[in-house]
Amino acid sequence: MRCILWGANGAMGKLIDSILKDEIVGRVSIDGENGVPRTAGELGRVEADVVIDFSHHTAVSGVLEYAEEIRATAVIGTTGHTPEEKAMIQAASQRIPVFYSGNMSLGIAVLCRLAKQAAAAFPQADIEIVEVHHTRKVDAPSGTAHMIFDAIRQVRPQAVEHCGRAGEGKRTAEEIGISSLRLGNVVGIHEVHIDAGSQRLTLRHEAVTRDMLAEGGVEAARFVAGKPAGLYNMQDMLG
């Protein structure tokens, strides 16, 4: 598998580089350090099977354009995309295979599936999501917490996302609360609490190191390479 890596000098890029090694045939990084091209123009045309993006969500337009130009698969590992950027991803998937996930962890994909199954099994249960991350994380709730909510909403279309809790007012039956904690150097913890009255269920995933995201990104690249045009995600990889 021949890969081009966007965001090669970033933390995730370096991890992926260490896994794929000789399979990397091209690199791009906005900082230009270590002689790495800063743009697609500086890189030039390089034949590859997959373009893996772990740079920044604002780069997605250039990543997709380059992947289409060389007729390669695109794996988008960045988060925080605007509605316009998500529309670009959707449009590109009509022409090339695109793998896009808000979290590249296979364990999180399993958690989302289990949360969906639990919500279906206990249609009247109260459900709350709790996410914990390090103090340097700038967004809340996490994109992964939104992913979990979206998975639950597939079987509870009436569900309403409620971020945080303050002031007066009872919890409504439709809401699914999301609580965010920022503590020390926590890589990432996500919990789903289901209260069915006579019984309670807690689903929990903890990221021990960020290696899981790099490993998931590589697995995603191998999974989607050679697939027909379309939009793929971690649930597709689970089968």
PLM-predicted stretches and their roles:
Residues 2, 6-45, 123-239:
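C-terminal substrate-binding/catalytic lobe of Rossmann-fold NAD(P)-dependent oxidoreductases
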Residues 4, 73-75, 99:
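Structural detector of well-ordered beta-strand residues that form the stable sheet scaffold
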Residues 17, 60-64:
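Generic hydrophobic/aromatic pocket-lining and core-packing "Φ" positions
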Residues 22, 72, 96:
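Short glycine/serine/threonine/alanine-rich loop segments
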Residues 30-33, 79-82, 103-104:
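Short, acidic/turn-prone active-site loops that include or flank metal/cofactor-
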Residues 51-52:
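N-terminal Rossmann-like NAD(P) cofactor-binding module of classical short-chain dehydrogenase/reductase
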Residues 55-56, 79, 180-182:
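Short glycine-/small-residue-rich Rossmann-like dinucleotide-binding loops
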Residues 63-65, 77-99, 109, 113-117:
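Rossmann-fold NAD(P)-binding glycine/threonine-rich loop
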